[in-house]
Swiss-Prot record:
Residues 707-790 are annotated as: Disordered. This is Polyphosphoinositide phosphatase. The keyword Hydrolase applies. The gene is Fig4. It comes from Mus musculus. Residues 758-770 have a biased composition (Acidic residues). Wide-spread. It catalyses: a 1,2-diacyl-sn-glycero-3-phospho-(1D-myo-inositol-3,5-bisphosphate) + H2O = a 1,2-diacyl-sn-glycero-3-phospho-(1D-myo-inositol-3-phosphate) + phosphate; a 1,2-diacyl-sn-glycero-3-phospho-(1D-myo-inositol-4,5-bisphosphate) + H2O = a 1,2-diacyl-sn-glycero-3-phospho-(1D-myo-inositol 4-phosphate) + phosphate; a 1,2-diacyl-sn-glycero-3-phospho-(1D-myo-inositol-3,4,5-trisphosphate) + H2O = a 1,2-diacyl-sn-glycero-3-phospho-(1D-myo-inositol-3,4-bisphosphate) + phosphate; O-phospho-L-seryl-[protein] + H2O = L-seryl-[protein] + phosphate. PANTHER family: POLYPHOSPHOINOSITIDE PHOSPHATASE. It is linked to Defects in Fig4 are the cause of the pale tremor phenotype which is a multi-organ disorder with neuronal degeneration in the central nervous system, peripheral neuronopathy and diluted pigmentation. At postnatal day three (P3), affected homozygotes have diluted pigmentation and reduced size. Intentional tremor develops during the second week after birth, and abnormal limb postures are evident by the third week. There is impaired motor coordination, muscle weakness and 'swimming' gait. There is progressive loss of mobility, reduction in body weight and juvenile lethality. Component of the PI(3,5)P2 regulatory complex/PAS complex, at least composed of PIKFYVE, FIG4 and VAC14. VAC14 nucleates the assembly of the complex and serves as a scaffold by pentamerizing into a star-shaped structure, which can bind a single copy each of PIKFYVE and FIG4 and coordinates their activities. Its main location: membrane.
Length: 907
C-alpha cells in the first residue's frame, strides 16, 4: 500500500505547433522530452472548434515517425521535390485557451515565460509573451467587419503583465489546502469508513488500486478554485475533450520571492496574490458586490515561509498565512459622469436582510473557516457623509447576520478610522495596527506542517500559548481569515495587511525555530525585505485596479518618508485620476471580453454599444428570479457543521470527488520533483540559477562593513542598510546634497494636498488638518556652512569602516608580525628578494615554507598518474592477492606478534 503522496507534474511543458492546410498539430512534451502527446485541430471548420486528442503517450521516435508521415502525406505533386508539407508555426510553453468572436476560433499560446518563485521544488512562472493564432484556413474563412475591433479589445488585456502559472503546483489554492489534499487519500485508507466511501464513489484512476498492495506513491491532482482562475472560460470548450495535462490554469495578481539568509541557512519568503476573476474590473466601474456575493477588487494574499535547505513537502518545513482584501459587500457605486476627484457614494439597492453580504460571507466560511474578522478602515467621522455611509451599512449587515450564527463562530467586526489617526501627531498608526495584528493572528492562527519544536515545549512563550487555529499531530492549521477593506482597498489596506503579515511572519519564524521570540522589529534586514515585497505587491495590485502605484506607503504612515516622496505621491494621484477618467472604460471592456462576461453574438448589440455592463455582472436582472435563501439560515448547513475548519479541506465525499488520484512507482517522472527541479539531463550554469539570482537579505540589505552582526533580525540604523549604502553610486555624497537642498526647500505638502483624490483623505474632512501641516520632515537639515561636518560624514574613520584603528607607530612585536607576513607573501609568489633583505632583527623566526610535493598540471582531458614507490606497490599487490586467496608468508615480526596475541588472549 502506498505510504506517500505527491503532486502530479504535467507532462505537457514544451509545445510545438505544426501547420498543414487542413489541420494544426500541437505536439506537447515533458521537459525531458521523453513523453509526448498530440492534439489535432481541424482548420476546415469556419466557426466551430474541432479538437481531437487520442490520449496516447508517444515516445520521441514515435513522434518523429508521425511527423514524417504527416510531412509526406501533405506534400502536393508540385512540391514533392521542393518545399515541405508540414510547417513549424511556433514553439510555446502552454495553452492559454481558445476564443471566438464573430468569425472562427483563435488559439492563444504562451511563447515566453520567466521563473518567479520556487515552492518545494515546484516552479512558478510568469507569462512574458503570448501568440494568438487564427485557426480556420483562409479558403474557408468568413470575414466580419467587426472582428478586428473585438480582437483589439481582447488583446488589450496584457497577458505579459502579472499572469502566473505552474505545471505542478495549484496556484488557485493556498499552501494549506495543497498540503492537506496530499494527506486525504492516505487518511481515507486508514479510516474505518474507507470501505463505505469507496462504495459511493471512486477517486482512483487505477481499478483495484487499494487491493493491489505493494509500495508506490499516490500522485494527486485537484480541481482548481475557479474563482481565481482567469482563463477558465478560454479552456471550458476543451475541458472535457482533452487530457488534463493540456489544461494550464493561470492566475492574475502578484508573485514575489526573496531569500532570508539566517547565518547561512536559506529561508524563502514568498508572497502570492490571487485576484478574483468574478466581478473583476477597474476602480470606479466596479464597486461593492454583485447578486452572487462576489465583490470588486477581491484579492487573496498568501505569505509562504519555507526552509530551502530541504525541498520536499513531506520532509521540509513550510508555513503560510492568508488574508483577504475586497470591497464592502453591499450594492453601492460612485457616479463618474461628473469630473470630480471623489465622486459621491450612493447605495444602489436596499438590502435590509443583508442577502448579498450573506452570500459573500458564506463563501468565506466554506473556504477559510471561522472566525471571519473584518478590519474596516473607512472613515467614521466626517462633516459631510461620504465614506461613513459604507460603515453604517456594513455594521448593520454584520449585526443582522451574527444573530443566526453560533456564538463561537460569529463574524468579528473591527472598525478603525485609519485616516483620522494618521493626521494625529500624538498617535502612532503602526503601533495601533500592531496591536490589532496581534489580536487577529491569535484568533486565526497560521499554517505550519511540523509540530512544535522541543525547545518551544520546554520554554514556551506566553504569546505562543495564546495562539489560536487548529492544532493537529503534524502541525497547525489556520482557521478563519482577516478581511481588510477601505474604500478602494489599496493604500490603507496594503499598509494594514503588511502589519498583520509582519506579525504573522514572526510567529512563522518562531514555529520553524529560527528566532527565540515571536516578535520582529522595524529596521531589521528581515522586515525591510518583507516590506519591499509588500510594497511591490501593493504597487502591482494598485496598478491593476486603480491605474497607478500606491500613493501612501508604509514609510508614509511611519512618518519617515523623505520630502521628495510627496512629489511622487502627487504624480501617482494625478496618474490614478487620469487612468480612472480616460482609460478605465476601455480596460473594463477588455476584462469583460477576456473573462467571458460578454459573448459577441451576431444580430445582438456589440460590446461598445452597451450603455453599461451592470446587466452582464448581475445575471438575475435578465432572468427569472432563482429561489432565495432563507433570511435566517443564510449559511450552508454542511459548512457550519465542520466549523471552525474550512469545509473545503474536510475529508468528505464532495471534496474527494474533486481529486484525481493515481498510483505511480516511486521514481516515475510524473511525481519526481527532484528530477523536475534539478534537471540532470540538461547543462546549466550558476549565472542562470534562480536561487542565486533572487533578492537576498545578505546581499541586498545587510551592510557590507566589517564587524556587523550578520543576523537579519538585528536592528540597524537607516543609513547602515545595504540598499541605502551600496545600492547606488556615491550615495553618501547624494545624501549630503539632499540635506543641503532640503534646508532651503519648502516644507512638505499636507496629506490633504498630496492626495485630494486618493482614498485616504476626504475633501470635506479637515478637522485635523493643522496637525498634518505641522509635521516636520524626517531628513536632518544641514546648513550650508557646515561643510566640515558634511566631509566627516563622507570620509568615515577606519575604526567605523573596518573595525580596527592603526596608530601612528607600530610596536616592535607588530612590526615583526607584519614583516613575517610580507616574507610569506613574497615566498608564495616566488619573487626576487635580492634587494628586499629585511633586517636580521625583524626576520628572525620567519617561517620558510618548502614544498615537499610537486603535482603535475592535470586537466579535464588528461591526468598523469602519480609515482608510487616500490614498498607501496608491494603492499598493494599483496592486498590484491589476499583477496584471491593467495596469502603471503608471515615474517618473523608478524609471527612473534601473533604468538603474543594468542598468549594474552587464551593462555
Amino acid at each position: 500500500m502506498p505510504t506517500a503522496a505527491a503532486p502530479i507534474i504535467s507532462s505537457v511543458q514544451k509545445l510545438v505547433l505544426y501547420e498543414t492546410r487542413a489541420r494544426y498539430f500541437l505536439v506537447g512534451s515533458n521537459h525531458a522530452e521523453t513523453k509526448y502527446r498530440v492534439l489535432k485541430i481541424d482548420r476546415t471548420e469556419p466557426k466551430d472548434l474541432v479538437v481531437i486528442d487520442d490520449r496516447h503517450v508517444y515516445t520521441q521516435q514515435e513522434v518523429r515517425e508521425l511527423l514524417g508521415r504527416l510531412d509526406l502525406g501533405n506534400r502536393t505533386k508540385m512540391s514533392q521535390k521542393g518545399s515541405s508539407g508540414l510547417f513549424r508555426a511556433v514553439s510555446a510553453f502552454g495553452v492559454v485557451g481558445f476564443v471566438r468572436f464573430l468569425e472562427g476560433y483563435y488559439i492563444v499560446l504562451i511563447t515566453k515565460r520567466r521563473k518567479m518563485a520556487d515552492i518545494g521544488g515546484h516552479a512558478i512562472y510568469k507569462i512574458e509573451d503570448t501568440s494568438m493564432i487564427y485557426i480556420p484556413n483562409d479558403s474557408v474563412r468568413i470575414s466580419h467587419p467587426d472582428e478586428a475591433r473585438y480582437l483589439r479589445i481582447f488583446q488589450n488585456v496584457d497577458l505579459s503583465s502579472n499572469f502566473y502559472f505552474s505545471y505542478s503546483y495549484d496556484l488557485s489554492h493556498s499552501l494549506q489546502y495543497n498540503l492537506t489534499v496530499l494527506r486525504m487519500p492516505l487518511e481515507m485508507l486508514k479510516s474505518e469508513t474507507s470501505k463505505a466511501c469507496q462504495e459511493s464513489f471512486d477517486i482512483f484512476e487505477d481499478e483495484g488500486l487499494i487491493t493491489q498492495g505493494g509500495s508506490g506513491v499516490f500522485g494527486i491532482s485537484s480541481e482548481p478554485y475557479m474563482k481565481y482562475v482567469w482563463n477558465g472560460e478560454l479552456l471550458d470548450i476543451i475541458k472535457n475533450t482533452v487530457h488534463r495535462d493540456w489544461l494550464l490554469y493561470i492566475i492574475h495578481g502578484f508573485c514575489g520571492q526573496s531569500k532570508l539568509l539566517i547565518y547561512g541557512r536559506p529561508v524563502y519568503v514568498t508572497l502570492i496574490a490571487r485576484r478574483s476573476s468574478r466581478f473583476a474590473g477597474t476602480r470606479f466601474l466596479k464597486r461593492g458586490a454583485n447578486c452572487e456575493g462576489d465583490v470588486a477588487n477581491e484579492v487573496e494574499t498568501e505569505q509562504i515561509l519555507c526552509d530551502a535547505s530541504v525541498m520536499s513537502f513531506t520532509a521540509g518545513s513550510y508555513s503560510s498565512y492568508v488574508q483577504v482584501r475586497g470591497s464592502v459587500p453591499l450594492f453601492w457605486s460612485q457616479d463618474i459622469s461628473t469630473m470630480m476627484p471623489k465622486p459621491p457614494i450612493t447605495l444602489d439597492q436596499a438590502d435590509p436582510f443583508a442577502h448579498v453580504a450573506a452570500l459573500h460571507f458564506d463563501q468565506m466560511l466554506q473556504r477559510f473557516g471561522s472566525p471571519i474578522i473584518i478590519l474596516n478602515l473607512v472613515k467614521e467621522r466626517e462633516k459631510r457623509k461620504h465614506e461613513r455611509i459604507l460603515s453604517e451599512e456594513l455594521v448593520a449587515a454584520v449585526t443582522y447576520l451574527n444573530q443566526f450564527l453560533p456564538p463561537e463562530h460569529t463574524i468579528v467586526y473591527i472598525p478603525w478610522d485609519m485616516a483620522k489617526y494618521t493626521k494625529s501627531k500624538l498617535c502612532n498608526v503602526l503601533d495601533r495596527l500592531n496591536v490589532i495584528a496581534e489580536s487577529v493572528v491569535k484568533k486565526t492562527g497560521f499554517f505550519v506542517n511540523r509540530p512544535d519544536s522541543y525547545c518551544s515545549i520546554l520554554r514556551p512563550d506566553e504569546k505562543w500559548n495564546e495562539l489560536g487555529g487548529h492544532v493537529i499531530p503534524t502541525g497547525r492549521l489556520q482557521t478563519g481569515i482577516l478581511r481588510t477593506n477601505c474604500v478602494d482597498c489599496l493604500d490603507r489596506t496594503n499598509t494594514a495587511q503588511f502589519m498583520v503579515g509582519k506579525c504573522a511572519l514572526a510567529y512563522q519564524l518562531y514555529s520553524l525555530g529560527l528566532i527565540d521570540k515571536p516578535n520582529l522589529q522595524f529596521d531589521t534586514d528581515a522586515v525591510r525585505l518583507f516590506e519591499e515585497l509588500y510594497e511591490d505587491h501593493g504597487d502591482t495590485l494598485s496598478l491593476q485596479y486603480g491605474g497607478s502605484q500606491l500613493v501612501h506607503r508604509v514609510k508614509t504612515y511611519r512618518k519617515i518618508a523623505p520630502w521628495t516622496q510627496h512629489s511622487k505621491d502627487i504624480m501617482q494621484t494625478l496618474s490614478r485620476y487620469y487612468s480612472n477618467a480616460f482609460s478605465d472604460a476601455d480596460r473594463q471592456d477588455s476584462i469583460n471580453l477576456f473573462l467571458g462576461v460578454f459573448h459577441p453574438t451576431e444580430g445582438k448589440p456589440h460590446l461598445w454599444e452597451l450603455p453599461t455592463d451592470f446587466y452582464l455582472h448581475h445575471k438575475n436582472t435578465m432572468s427569472l428570479l432563482p429561489p432565495r435563501r432563507s433570511y435566517t439560515y443564510w449559511w450552508t448547513p454542511e459548512v457550519v457543521k465542520h466549523l471552525p475548519l474550512p469545509y473545503d479541506e474536510v475529508i468528505c465525499a464532495a471534496n474527494l470527488k474533486k481529486l484525481m488520484v493515481k498510483k505511480f512507482h516511486r521514481w516515475e517522472e510524473e511525481i519526481d520533483i527532484h528530477n523536475e527541479f534539478f534537471r540532470p539531463y540538461e547543462l546549466s550554469s550558476f549565472d542562470d540559477t534562480f536561487c542565486l539570482a533572487m533578492t537576498s537579505s545578505a546581499r541586498d540589505f545587510m551592510p557590507k562593513t566589517v564587524g556587523i552582526d550578520p543576523s537579519p533580525f538585528t536592528v540597524r540604523k537607516p543609513d547602515e542598510t545595504g540598499k541605502s549604502v551600496l545600492g547606488n553610486k556615491n550615495t553618501r555624497e547624494e545624501a549630503v546634497l539632499q540635506r543641503k537642498t532640503a534646508a532651503s526647500a519648502p516644507p512638505p505638502p499636507s496629506e490633504e494636498a498630496v492626495s485630494s483624490s486618493s482614498e485616504d483623505d476626504s475633501g470635506t474632512d479637515r478637522e485635523d488638518e493643522g496637525s498634518i501641516s505641522q509635521r516636520s520632515t524626517p531628513v536632518k537639515m544641514t546648513d550650508t556652512g557646515d561643510s566640515a561636518k558634511a566631509t566627516e560624514n563622507v570620509v568615515q574613520p577606519m575604526k567605523e569602516v573596518y573595525g580596527v584603528s592603526l596608530s601612528s607607530s607600530l610596536s616592535e612585536e607588530d612590526h615583526s608580525i607584519y614583516a613575517r607576513f610580507v616574507q610569506l607573501g613574497q615566498s608564495q609568489h616566488k619573487q626576487d628578494r635580492g634587494n628586499q633583505q629585511l633586517c636580521s632583527r625583524c626576520s628572525d623566526g620567519v617561517i620558510k615554507l618548502t614544498p615537499i610535493s610537486a603535482f603535475s598540471q592535470d586537466n579535464i582531458y588528461e591526468v598523469q598518474p602519480p609515482r608510487v614507490d616500490r614498498k607501496s606497490t608491494e603492499i598493494f599487490q599483496a592486498h590484491i592477492q589476499a583477496s584471491q586467496g593467495i596469502m603471503q608468508p608471515l615474517g618473523k615480526e608478524d609471527t612473534a606478534m601473533y604468538r603474543e596475541y594468542i598468549r594474552n588472549r587464551y593462555l
